[in-house]
Amino acid sequence: MEGDRVAGRPVLSSLPVLLLLPLLMLRAAALHPDELFPHGESWGDQLLQEGDDESSAVVKLANPLHFYEARFSNLYVGTNGIISTQDFPRETQYVDYDFPTDFPAIAPFLADIDTSHGRGRVLYREDTSPAVLGLAARYVRAGFPRSARFTPTHAFLATWEQVGAYEEVKRGALPSGELNTFQAVLASDGSDSYALFLYPANGLQFLGTRPKESYNVQLQLPARVGFCRGEADDLKSEGPYFSLTSTEQSVKNLYQLSNLGIPGVWAFHIGSTSPLDNVRPAAVGDLSAAHSSVPLGRSFSHATALESDYNEDNLDYYDVNEEEAEYLPGEPEEALNGHSSIDVSFQSKVDTKPLEESSTLDPHTKEGTSLGEVGGPDLKGQVEPWDERETRSPAPPEVDRDSLAPSWETPPPYPENGSIQPYPDGGPVPSEMDVPPAHPEEEIVLRSYPASGHTTPLSRGTYEVGLEDNIGSNTEVFTYNAANKETCEHNHRQCSRHAFCTDYATGFCCHCQSKFYGNGKHCLPEGAPHRVNGKVSGHLHVGHTPVHFTDVDLHAYIVGNDGRAYTAISHIPQPAAQALLPLTPIGGLFGWLFALEKPGSENGFSLAGAAFTHDMEVTFYPGEETVRITQTAEGLDPENYLSIKTNIQGQVPYVSANFTAHISPYKELYHYSDSTVTSTSSRDYSLTFGAINQTWSYRIHQNITYQVCRHAPRHPSFPTTQQLNVDRVFALYNDEERVLRFAVTNQIGPVKEDSDPTPGNPCYDGSHMCDTTARCHPGTGVDYTCECASGYQGDGRNCVDENECATGFHRCGPNSVCINLPGSYRCECRSGYEFADDRHTCILITPPANPCEDGSHTCAPAGQARCVHHGGSTFSCACLPGYAGDGHQCTDVDECSENRCHPAATCYNTPGSFSCRCQPGYYGDGFQCIPDSTSSLTPCEQQQRHAQAQYAYPGARFHIPQCDEQGNFLPLQCHGSTGFCWCVDPDGHEVPGTQTPPGSTPPHCGPSPEPTQRPPTICERWRENLLEHYGGTPRDDQYVPQCDDLGHFIPLQCHGKSDFCWCVDKDGREVQGTRSQPGTTPACIPTVAPPMVRPTPRPDVTPPSVGTFLLYTQGQQIGYLPLNGTRLQKDAAKTLLSLHGSIIVGIDYDCRERMVYWTDVAGRTISRAGLELGAEPETIVNSGLISPEGLAIDHIRRTMYWTDSVLDKIESALLDGSERKVLFYTDLVNPRAIAVDPIRGNLYWTDWNREAPKIETSSLDGENRRILINTDIGLPNGLTFDPFSKLLCWADAGTKKLECTLPDGTGRRVIQNNLKYPFSIVSYADHFYHTDWRRDGVVSVNKHSGQFTDEYLPEQRSHLYGITAVYPYCPTGRK
């Protein structure tokens, strides 16, 4: 083999095509980290400061660069994988949002990156060294052959080396070991600027980051890669942008694929002194070296796998109508001329020759002509025909193995005897995808496939793979190593259920079964009709008038056996619909997709299946308006309907109302190249209205890209060009229905002249008489037969759906349901079951393992520690009170060493607890001991002394009798632990029917009051009737209504002396969802205000002092409790506001206008008052309320939110009560507490439904509602959000716990687990403050230790409800 030599390495000039393919396959290995551009301090790099959101100082470029149409000299480099021409805003304004940004951006990997604590580094520099400029030039020339003379004069490099993603700090959690390395290079020659993005092998270990303010811990944003010009000058429209990634798979493709032939390397043309509408990616796969003066149109290469939002198509290069092109014969060898080699290595001695002098730097042809200039230096004015065959398989670039990786092995020698022949009959040259790629790690498995005529015997461990028979007589083989590769055994579920899976040398492929067609992953029955559903969005200028529409419906119906396609688009605005009448290609896509196939041809669905992107650009003449239409197919739904999304952007000519469009039958040529189909044509259309007949035209460029299975051999007879014949073209807009309709009839087959007289079989031209659900089988001449499609039955001319579910001809297994569909059926598993691997058998869903339940956790024994399950296999351990340690190892705390008992008592330490007992001669509870008296004691005092002695034992809940000064029983007795009260006679025995539950008004005991004229109430009459029925003395398990002194029903009712309790309204009716289980008392709120027995104070505000203080509600008043730091200033507490006849429950504060807001369940109102002297209350909501309880104020949006536990609603309104809105009215039983995070826009609330308590969240407009917490909670009364720690915390009167979690529900932990009966809670500094119904006061808890630090018990002994903290300033959300 002859070849030129440069720097001691051979440079291939002209090789037979099959010798070139193995070299390309050897280069398929990903970019090695050593092949990045040189970087580090030794190369002059500057180092960006460590941190989460750092930005470099401005970099003043010695030579300006062009970005889009602008020229700039300043650059900034950011931590988060981004470069900009201006300083960055705070990361919260862009890092968690999709492209485009509102500032100029060059983003090789935009994500939330954090280099704190030495987790990687970011380096950057401007460079003019020949080594860097030479490598940049070689990359650019390889990707942009028309820029073969590009010689950069300066470059800018930025490298992110071993950087990590931002992670929330969690106790005991180690940082992730996933680190990324990538590089961006900007190169310019003063006129044009190019960007290179490099991603080495194993360089992207994380593909995205989680938003800091995520609602859901599972949410992860894929990294954004691309370019953005920034907002336009008027700040009302976004500038052009180019996005390369949108999914996790597209990010993964960054290092697996390439747009210039080297996996992990990407090149883009980003700026020029000439007009550049948008960034243009490299597309080396689009090149055709033979007759390269007429480059092919847009042909997506690997870059399409990244799901680009803007697809570069080089439409400017189309200067010829494909329908008029003359196809000349050409030799396959011509395709090899002109491809370059790329040397990506850096030698120890840098070649300092000018770039023009090194023959390895320019991609020249054998004759010395640069690629893209064959036939003349200027392509714009020259149009020459090219070989039709080259549209099928453009020749790959010629690559020298040594120049790619000098340290790797060279390929084995190949015979030079010329035995390798071109394709027979002058067929197309195979591309690099026509033979299996050589991956050294992959295992080769050959199985029969209809397109291949032989198999090769296999040996264990390594397999030999011969070239296909049609390549020629060469018997050269390649040896592969048997290693991991994807096979049917583990991946057959990726195939359609109407397909079979076949293993090949490098992987597996799916193929549709007989009587079905498609690409194997999506298969449809032959001859059956098909349906399409989708959405259409558009941003158009009709003439000069902007028209916008979003997600309007698209429906299409296709008659598969004659190629008819009907499309309807609903509710497009009339000006746009009228202007879109000529654009039949919108519905024409379905014509190509399901066209009637002539022999040897395939329609679009047979190739692309149900996942592809159709991109077309239409230019109207003579006005040259341009519109871009992108249609994305997103698979088949359960009914086998194709789902498609359409986006229309650009300008279209105005079409007057009442004009109709007429388009004659036409033909289109479609060119097939690997995973891309292209077509270019011109089309005339007429607009008529009465006698007016106008003729216009447009030119259309189409690109259809899809994924092919590269493992199966390509069928050699598949045509590279097919002709689509379109007849009966119909377009109509119905103004009354607002529906735009298209109809076309399509046939696809070989390219034929119009004069071809050969008659067609009715099966091929659609003139047969078969049923629309039947397949047409051609016979001899014009004979044919009809056969009903799969899933239908009949004689072929009349077919009806076969109900497989009714006849039993289905494969749905036990525990599944068969659902009949037109021509098919679907299996669905019953609740609690899921599909097995065969997708027919339903198996029982195995619940995920819970280490805390199955005993696989590593926590200390149950009596010492608590295991907390966090989902999946994760858990945490926490020592119980009385023990210390990390939860895995817990040791008993010796409380006796802390001297907690009275000096006259003895301390007894027990595991996890302790007790105190008074010494002989003293009596008391051990914490307080009093010398014993020798005087005689009354029965009450004796029982009291005995109970106090028993109370010293741990866990004791004895009642301690209350005696008066003479030692007699007080008529009213109350249990100090449970809160129950009752009347006793002089001997201390309980008076039947007088017991009242905690939280209610105690009974009136003692002498009967003077007779009054008040008649007995419903409650009193019902109580008397039941007592009479029970014989005057009810048993402990019999219910007796509890009434207060005025005869009203006490809000809390209990069944006898049991703990089965529930809430009632003022009429005694049970409140739904409040019935409790033993051990938990529901938190019932009265709805009738108690009578005022003292003079009523003025309802105005007693102004508080300056500083932070607490406001709490207590029946008819709002109390004021100042803070000294975090300590309660109990001596300065006072009443802020008194409101006779009210029951004030919810309370919150507006820090901007210094106003307090509250809810009143007695008055059924929401009111407010200022905190200045003498301010009077103002009612702002007084209708549509029954029991308004929780209240939250958004001081930023000037909005309030409240809950109503009777109407079961959550509502919002502005702070003046206007613009009232119901956010939620379903799936609520007892909504109570509510909290708002104004800075991040989140709303949280509790629902203490006894059957299913929960904490929920949503956005402030009511969107994205979801359950945050619904396990291990009982009666979540109180809720608070701390804007400083970003923690959501709640107090639970059922579990007796105070707990906190992150806003997304993660990081849940218990602060205190021994609360009494909390109602409301607020967070301030390092403390929580909550109201408690057992203590009837305010209790403070330290956030960090969980210890009770103080309590305040108001003079008035009644329940406290809501509580809030009043700051002297408004909290902010800055980090």
UniProtKB/Swiss-Prot annotation:
Highly N-glycosylated. GO terms for molecular function: calcium ion binding; collagen binding; extracellular matrix structural constituent. Residues 528-758 form the Nidogen G2 beta-barrel domain. Detected in placenta (at protein level). Heart and bone. Less in pancreas, kidney and skeletal muscle. The gene is NID2. Residues 1-30 form the signal peptide. GO terms for cellular component: basement membrane; collagen-containing extracellular matrix; extracellular exosome; extracellular region; extracellular space; plasma membrane. Pfam families: cEGF, EGF_3, EGF_CA, G2F, Ldl_recept_b, NIDO, Thyroglobulin_1. The modification Omega-N-methylarginine is found at residue 1308. PANTHER family: NIDOGEN 2, VITELLOGENIN RECEPTOR-LIKE PROTEIN-RELATED-RELATED. The lineage of its organism: Eukaryota, Metazoa, Chordata, Craniata, Vertebrata. Interacts with LAMA2. Interacts with COL13A1. Interacts with EFEMP2. It is found in: Secreted, Extracellular space, Extracellular matrix, Basement membrane. Residues 386-403 have a biased composition (Basic and acidic residues). The keyword Hydrolase does not apply. This is Nidogen-2. Gene3D superfamilies: Green fluorescent protein, Laminin, Thyroglobulin type-1, TolB, C-terminal domain. Residues 348-437, 992-1016 are annotated as: Disordered. Its main location: secreted. LDL-receptor class B repeats lie at residues 1154-1197, 1198-1240, 1241-1285, 1286-1327, 1329-1373. Residues 999-1014 have a biased composition (Pro residues).
